[in-house]
Amino acid sequence: MQFLDFLIALLPALFWGSVVLINVFVGGGPYNQIRGTTLGALIVGLGLLITGFAKFNNPTVIIVGLISGALWAFGQANQLKSISLIGVSNTMPVSTGMQLVGTTLFSVIFLGEWSSMTQIIFGLIAMILLVTGVALTSLKAKNERQSDNPEFKKAMGILIVSTVGYVGFVVLGDIFGVGGTDALFFQSVGMAIGGFILSMNHKTSLKSTALNLLPGVIWGIGNLFMFYSQPKVGVATSFSLSQLLVIVSTLGGIFILGERKDRRQMTGIWAGIIIIVIAAIILGNLK
């Protein structure tokens, strides 16, 4: 593995972790944010179409791409709703943990990914670590009863719904063997359609939507770096490194967006992030 290839493999985490930070920074609320983000992803998809990476000779790629893209938009829209309630630093570790648990359980139960006792043992260890990490990142501040906070409870319910969309986005591609740059254009079309449907009955503005194009472009470019790095460093390594996005988004929420945390919460966040990343590395190497 070349050092440059390793650095490029880190870029998806940087790009994907920055998406929600830019969404919140430019503002506009979750409906402008999802519409703008999905249209931004479509811009990258159109670039692939123009350069000849989108092929129309495989109906499976087209259909799976469209549906999985719409599912991603559903997951992202609900994640943005959670962020509007409890912030980036509270949402992203929980969302990342839920996604890893959801995709892993589906792959194990329905796709038979863990076929050996070693995989089962290490997989269960990783799942326990994920739950522990998520719990640590969600520690309440002193004198705060977070479990009685209606916004926190509502956000957790929204994140469960969000996870369904994200898991569907990932596992559909696995089930039908669809992925890579061939599918990205059709996924981006599905995202744009999904983003429009999800926001059509809500008040949006052209300015706020336009400002949120950038996160979508960044998300699409992060995907391209992922596709480049997988054959260079391996699927397991690229997957594990991409999960470092939770560090970028969580710490960005605290230090860039100014979300306040006390010492106890910061200790829990650092410990939780490290544990979630370790679990992601274990899961990545079980693939």
From Swiss-Prot:
Subcellular location: Cell membrane
Membrane topology value: Multi-pass membrane protein
Keywords linked to the UniProt accession: Cell membrane, Membrane, Sugar transport, Transmembrane, Transmembrane helix, Transport
Transmembrane segment boundaries: 7-29, 34-53, 60-77, 114-136, 157-179, 184-201, 208-230, 235-257, 269-286
Pfam families noted in UniProt: Sugar_transport
Entry GO CC: plasma membrane
A single MF term (Gene Ontology): carbohydrate transmembrane transporter activity
PANTHER family: TRANSMEMBRANE PROTEIN 144
Similarity remark: Belongs to the GRP transporter (TC 2.A.7.5) family.
Reported function: Involved in the uptake of glucose.
Record's protein name: Probable glucose uptake protein GlcU
